Curated annotation (Swiss-Prot):
Functions in the N-end rule pathway of protein degradation where it conjugates Leu from its aminoacyl-tRNA to the N-termini of proteins containing an N-terminal aspartate or glutamate. The keyword Cytoplasm applies. Belongs to the R-transferase family. Bpt subfamily. The lineage of its organism: Bacteria, Pseudomonadati, Pseudomonadota, Gammaproteobacteria, Alteromonadales. Its EC number is 2.3.2.29. Its main location: cytoplasm. One of its GO terms (cellular component) is cytoplasm. This is Aspartate/glutamate leucyltransferase. It is an enzyme of class 2 (transferase).
Length: 235
């Protein structure tokens, strides 16, 4: 498919209305890109107007009575870690991390433990290998895995899309027994550092949802930009 978004028409569909997986009292409806294959340049343009990826599906909330999902991104060259985030980095100096494009059984085993212990009340439970692959993998954009190790033991993974001018955080998970390390925070900080090293402009974090405690943490990384009807704005 031609990556020139100004000349290539894109087929977009709209889903049925169904119960929201983030806010109990709301209903959800999605705009869905109906293209089997995109390319990184076009996908990055879709990210910039609020779309996200789940597997090979590209979607954007268009809910009938709610606008709680706010696309959020970090301009990584301006990012300044908070005191708490600096402590997280300092407290995890004994850890090592590496980047790989390989999917491993060790990664999935860690994911399964994470979902069973941390998200047993959510839509991703019970975990399965098929669900894991459908959720994270995309045939036209292989993800990058950032693996974090403690004494050669895998304890955290961030799944990330690498795009021409940005990184996009898809999902992160970690060893529940190591929760005291604030590994979710650490993984975002590592992705931000990686984006800087690769001379990217943005790290996309998905949707900020203020009314959902598990989805409201992204405002802690500053400065950040929120996509509004007027465009991306610092908040």
């Amino acid at each position: 498919m031609n990556s020139n978004a100004n000349k290539t028409p894109i087929a977009i569909g709209i889903s049925q209305i169904f119960p929201c997986s983030y806010l109990e009292d709301q209903q959800e409806q999605l705009l869905v890109i109906q293209e089997e294959t995109l390319d990184p340049i076009l996908f990055e343009r879709l990210l910039a107007i609020g779309f996200r990826r789940s597997g090979s599906a590209i979607y954007k909330p268009r809910c009938p009575r709610c606008s709680a999902c706010q696309p959020i991104r970090l301009p990584v060259r301006e990012f300044i870690p908070s005191k708490r985030q600096k402590r997280t980095l300092a407290n995890n100096r004994d850890l090592t991390w590496r980047i790989t494009s390989s999917q491993t059984d060790e990664q999935y085993t860690l994911y399964e433990r994470y979902i069973r212990q941390r998200h047993f009340d959510g839509p991703m439970f019970p975990p399965s290998k098929e669900q894991y692959e459908q959720f994270l993998f995309c045939h036209w954009l292989p993800p990058t895995f950032i693996e974090v190790y403690a004494n050669n033991k895998l304890i955290a993974v961030a799944v990330t899309d690498t795009l021409p001018n940005s990184l996009s955080a898809i999902y992160s998970y970690f060893d529940p027994d190591e929760a005291h390390r604030s590994l979710g925070v650490l993984l975002i900080l590592i992705q931000c550092r990686l984006a800087k090293l690769q001379r990217k402009e943005f790290l996309y974090l998905g949707y900020q949802i203020d009314a959902n405690r598990k989805m409201s943490y992204k405002r802690l990384y500053r400065p950040y930009q929120i996509l509004t009807p007027q465009g991306w704005e610092y908040s």
